[in-house]
Amino acid sequence: MSVSMLKSSPLHSASVASGLLKCFLGAHPLLPATYEKCGLTTSCRRSTTIHSPAKIWQPPSCRYFSKSRPILSPLPETSEQSSPSYLSTANKPPGTDEQGLKSDRGDINSDSKSTSKTSRSKKSNVPRSSKSTTQKREKPEKPRELEPWQIQKQALKKKFPEGWNPRKRLHPDTLDTIRHLHQQDPNIYSTPALAQEFKVSPEAIRRILKSKWQPTPEVAAERRERWEKRRKRIWNQLSEIGVRPHRPSFADVSDTKVLEKKRRTVGSK
């Protein structure tokens, strides 16, 4: 038995050395089945655990080169370098940073002041509930006293809803003619008919009919002279211009029959 052990000793030492080398290189040793029961496997495991931190350089395989990226590929630009803020800060001189900080502080202060002003203005705009305002609201507003001219204006509007025609100066003989026609036949020569005929307002006809005042013979003579002078003056002025004045149809009328004839002739035309 001793002879056989001696013969196998050099072979055993060579296999152990090769196994240790493979363990150091990181490859698992392919030990024969006879050494599985031996303690060499345990020693190899211990040696791998002890020497695992010290990695030995191994040449990469061809598959690594085929799958790996190209070595000279351009590196992606960082977001900081590409951002405009980074470029602006990089190009700025050193003194501008302090100025920017001061301006930022000034903006913050101005914003705070503006917010405080707006809050004050809102508070000032809020209506204050005071006793004076409540008393004013509770008291009913008294109607204003109208002036005399306002009262008269309202009365005229009520009396003449269609409007007020200004007074027209009529000849004294015309006033007598209006009264005479109305006395002859009030139904035919009514107030609207007389107003349409003499081109005055119905209110003026009513006043003429109601008035009972008659001038004295002396006043009537003076009035006729005055009106004759006025007529001549107007006639002369218009004749100088070259326009013949229109003489009204009722100037010399004193009878109702004449007016009736003229009305019939106008209606037939």
UniProtKB/Swiss-Prot annotation:
Native species: Ajellomyces dermatitidis (strain ER-3 / ATCC MYA-2586) (Blastomyces dermatitidis)
Function: Required for respiratory activity and maintenance and expression of the mitochondrial genome.
Family (UniProt): Belongs to the RRG9 family.
Matching InterPro entries: NGRN/Rrg9 (IPR010487)
Mitochondrion listed as a keyword: yes
Pfam families reported in the protein's UniProt record: Neugrin (PF06413)
Main localization, broad class: mitochondrion
Compositional bias segments (type: Basic and acidic residues): 99-110, 135-147
Name of the protein: Required for respiratory growth protein 9, mitochondrial
Gene Ontology CC annotations of this record: mitochondrion; nucleus
Assigned keywords, A-Z: Mitochondrion, Transit peptide
Location of this chain's protein in the cell: Mitochondrion
Transit peptide: 1-72
Source superkingdom: Eukaryota
Polar residues biased stretches: 76-91
Stretches for region Disordered: 73-171
